[in-house]
């Protein structure tokens, strides 16, 4: 009976020591998981990049003159919805429209230039309200250079 008691005590000690190792292992695993989580969070925080708007994507493809006239057009259209609609058109048509605006505004000089540019803004607003397909030399022409 004594031997059984001694063996039983040894068994309990052995079982207890195994359990304590498992606790340490669990604690280490928990700490490693937390540190991995922190590492992952820092990586996730560094990588999220705000998607670029249509305007930013278009600006990357435009020349400096075209960017200037895009700003002018944004101001002319005023309503964000109209400008967003304009940005939805085909890139080549947008570039053609901006080049047309540049050529027309280059004609405006002299005493009445500011008044003529304001009138041209209104003309552009009206021309673009029907879409970009008809925009150009037919319906978006300034009175600049007509001798006035």
From Swiss-Prot:
Region ranges (Disordered): 26-58
Subcellular location: Cell outer membrane
Stretches with biased composition (Basic and acidic residues): 38-58
Lipidation residue positions, type N-palmitoyl cysteine: 18
Induction comment from the UniProt entry of this chain: Strongly induced when grown at 35 degrees Celsius.
UniProt cross-references to InterPro entries, sorted A to Z: Mlp
Keyword annotations: Cell outer membrane, Lipoprotein, Membrane, Palmitate, Plasmid, Signal
Residue ranges of the TM segments: none
Membrane-related topology note: Lipid-anchor
Chain residues carrying a lipid of type S-diacylglycerol cysteine: 18
GO cellular component, one term: cell outer membrane
Annotated family: Belongs to the Multicopy lipoprotein (Mlp) family.
Role description: An outer membrane protein that may participate in pathogenesis. Some human Lyme disease patients have antibodies against this protein. The Mlp proteins probably undergo intragenic recombination, generating new alleles.
Name of the protein in question: Lipoprotein MlpA
Natural source organism: Borreliella burgdorferi (strain ATCC 35210 / DSM 4680 / CIP 102532 / B31)
Source taxonomy: Bacteria, Pseudomonadati, Spirochaetota, Spirochaetia, Spirochaetales
Gene: mlpA
